[in-house]
Swiss-Prot record:
Residues 6-237 form the ABC transporter domain. This is Lipoprotein-releasing system ATP-binding protein LolD 1. It is an enzyme of class 7 (translocase). The lineage of its organism: Bacteria, Pseudomonadati, Chlorobiota, Chlorobiia, Chlorobiales. InterPro entries: AAA+_ATPase, ABC_transporter-like_ATP-bd, ABC_transporter-like_CS, MacB-like_ATP-bd, P-loop_NTPase. Gene3D superfamilies: P-loop containing nucleotide triphosphate hydrolases. The keyword Ribonucleoprotein does not apply. PROSITE patterns: ABC_TRANSPORTER_1 (PS00211), ABC_TRANSPORTER_2 (PS50893), LOLD (PS51244). Its EC number is 7.6.2.-. GO terms for molecular function: ATP binding; ATP hydrolysis activity. CDD domains: ABC_MJ0796_LolCDE_FtsE. It is a peripheral membrane protein. Part of the ABC transporter complex LolCDE involved in the translocation of mature outer membrane-directed lipoproteins, from the inner membrane to the periplasmic chaperone, LolA. Responsible for the formation of the LolA-lipoprotein complex in an ATP-dependent manner. It is found in: Cell inner membrane.
């Protein structure tokens, strides 16, 4: 049986709008994600999807409740400790790629590994090139972001997110700025990573096609899990 990679218990998130007014985003949410799952989180705007994702990734803290990542409770960690966890165990992909414009594709992918300092610079460069090969950009090593299409930029961002072999890959609307063809290519890449590498993938999306093709779909309404369903993994093209 697959191990639990992410566990959330009694998560409540409130925003302080003023001295006397608080808004509840997530009222009381508990959830387990298992190693090797491909999960889509859906729901209307304002349902708490991105807030939930950021709490999973340690980018935001719950008002109450606890989060465990890979068996370690992360809710009590300070920012310096959480930065180390994010660098080593979590890969993030956003709607906008956030690539450094002055650096090439391979340099952007190298950045997380240079920060971690687990490998020498030569090996880091070789690993970055292999990651770009894996996402189909073997001929774009030296291209800067402005020399790449939107879909190619997002694939560089995915390669960068994979640089330190994360336990969990988190995506916040990663296909939101892409045309349908590029969005499908990104989905196929996520599905391949999930199938071939057993990579745990959790994606917030408004894309119904993307969500329906994931192995598990969690639908939020008003910060509560309205449905949580698993489907047979669909074959990729």
């Amino acid at each position: 049986m697959a191990e639990t990679i992410l566990r959330l218990k009694g998560i409540r998130k409130e925003l302080e709008l003023s001295r006397d007014v608080r808004q509840t985003i997530l009222p009381n949410l508990s959830l387990e994600i298992f190693e090797g799952e491909f999960v889509a989180i859906t729901g209307p705007s304002g349902s708490g999807k991105s807030t939930l994702l950021y709490i999973m990734g340690g980018l935001d803290k719950p008002t109450f409740g606890k989060v465990w990542l890979d068996g370690q409770e992360i809710t009590g960690l300070d920012e310096a400790e959480m930065t180390v966890i994010r660098n080593r165990k979590i890969g993030f992909i956003y709607q906008f790629h956030f690539l450094l414009p002055e650096f090439s594709a391979v340099d952007n992918v190298m950045m997380p590994m240079l920060i971690r300092r687990k490998y020498g610079k030569k090996e880091i460069r070789e690993r970055a090139m292999k990651l770009l090969d894996m996402v189909g950009l073997e001929d774009k090593y030296t291209n800067k972001p402005n020399q790449l299409s939107g879909g190619q930029q997002q694939r560089v961002a995915i390669a960068r997110a994979l640089a330190n072999e994360p336990k969990v890959l988190l995506g916040d609307e990663p296909t939101g700025n892409l045309d349908s063809r590029s969005a499908n290519n990104v989905y196929e890449l996520f599905a391949r990573l999930n199938c071939e590498l057993n990579q745990t993938v959790i994606v917030v999306t408004h894309d119904e096609d993307f969500a329906n093709r994931a192995g598990r779909r969690i639908h939020l309404v008003d910060g509560k899990i309205e449905s949580d369903s698993r489907t047979p993994r669909q074959a990729t093209a």
